[in-house]
Amino acid sequence: MPIDASILAARDTRRMPLIQSGSVRHNLAPFQPKSAYAGALLLLGDWEGAHTAAQDVHTPEGSYWHAIVHRQEPDSFNAGYWFRQVGKHPIFPAVLADAEAILQRFPSARVKLPAAWSPQFFIDLCESAVRQPGSQLEAAAIEIQHAEWCHLFDWCRNPV
């Protein structure tokens, strides 16, 4: 039986690590829209499956999932390439708004966000965060990544 994709979009779901830590087995049958499948696999910890699924979606959303996969690899150069393929995505303003709210809860993270959401800025922030395990910066980056995931997954399910 396929999983109900709406369960994955809940804001209180598990948080993904900033760097992938291997693959897991799952019983997640592909669901529609196809662009959301890569995100579901990523949330479930199936990095390789998410990578394969993202490669098969030739849309800005597929490129976005592909970029997140490479950001978690971590391969900042490849992540940057895929984010450039995305261009300016409609979820960017919402991700920025959530990032601003999240960072208010983590004042010692000392992050000054750009005026507009910048995927490259977030790649760099994640790279810094993983070098500071247990820090407020790492916790904030994980929360921002989760907000980004929620916005992209919701967009894939119901593009405006």
Regions found by a protein language model. Name each.
Residues 60-70, 74, 82:
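Alpha-helical protein-protein interaction scaffolds
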Residues 63, 76-78, 91-95:
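Short, solvent-exposed secondary-structure capping/transition elements
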